[in-house]
Amino acid sequence: MAGHSKWANIQHRKGRQDAKRGKLFTKAAKEIIIAAKGGGDPSMNPRLRAAIAAAKAVNLPKDKIEAAIRKGTGEDAGGDLTETFYEGYGPGGIAVMVEVATDNKNRTVAEVRHLFSKHGGSMGENGSVAWMFDRKGVISVEKSAYPEEKIMEAALEAGADDVIDDGEEWTIHTAMTDFTAVRDSLETAGIVMQSAELAMVPQNLVAVDADMGQKVLRLMDALDDNDDVQNVYANVDFPEDMPED
C-alpha cells in the first residue's frame, strides 16, 4: 500500500495548509449538514455520528458542530446542500471518484468536468468506476507515537476490519457501522488520530511510474482545491520516490 501512504502523506501536508484557511472546518461542517438531513439525533443517525467523529478529529469547535446540525435539520438557514459523486478517469486510465457537497450542481459539474479535461482525464457516467471502491471508515495514527500492540488492541477489539502499516502511519479500516466505536476506542486508549473519516477505499491499486504519478497527482490536487469538493479518491499506487511537485 505504498501509494496509499504517499497520497495520505500529501493529504496530511495539504491538511495543515487547508486548516489555516478553514477548509478542513468547512468540509467537516458540510458533511454534518448533509448527514443531519437524516435526523439531528446522533444516537439514531449513524452517518451523523460518523460525521461528528470526523469533525472532532480535525478539532471543529462544538458550537460549529451544533450549528451545522441545525442547518441540516432545517432549524437554521444555510443547509441547502446536495451531495453527489462524480466519476471519471485520470491519466493512465486511473479510476477517480470525486465527492462534492454543493448548492449549485450545474456549476460544480461544469467545473469538475473542466478539471478532468485540463489534466488529461475524462468524466465518466454514474457507476463507471464506483464498483471499484468500497465505502469504509478510515482512521490514521502516527506510527512512531504508540506501540503497535496498543493500536492493534484498541482498533481490532472495537471491530476494525484491518490495521495497515503505511510507512509513517497506521491506517485503520472499519465498516461504516463500526467507525464510531473504533474511533471511540482509540480515543479512550489515549491515542491521538491524525484523521478519521468515511472514505471510498479502492479494492485494488494500479501502480504507475513517477511521470504518470505526477500527472495523476496534479489532477487530484486540482480537484481537491475546488471549493465544492469534499474528497478525491483514486485507485492509484504512487511510487515511493515520486517527487510531489
From Swiss-Prot:
Gene3D superfamilies: 1.10.10.200, 3.30.70.980
GO biological process: regulation of DNA-templated transcription
A single GO cellular-component term on record: cytosol
GO molecular function annotations of the record: DNA binding
A Pfam family the protein falls into: TACO1_YebC_N
Subcellular location(s) per record: Cytoplasm
Residues covered by region (Disordered): 1-21
Highest taxon of the lineage: Bacteria
Keywords for the protein's UniProt record, in alphabetical order: Cytoplasm, DNA-binding, Transcription, Transcription regulation
Signal peptide: none
PANTHER family linked to this entry: TRANSCRIPTIONAL REGULATORY PROTEIN YEBC-RELATED, TRANSLATIONAL ACTIVATOR OF CYTOCHROME C OXIDASE 1
Matching NCBIfam families: PRK00110.1, PRK12378.1, YebC/PmpR family DNA-binding transcriptional regulator
Assigned protein family: Belongs to the TACO1 family.
Protein name as annotated: Probable transcriptional regulatory protein Ddes_0536
Source organism (scientific name): Desulfovibrio desulfuricans (strain ATCC 27774 / DSM 6949 / MB)
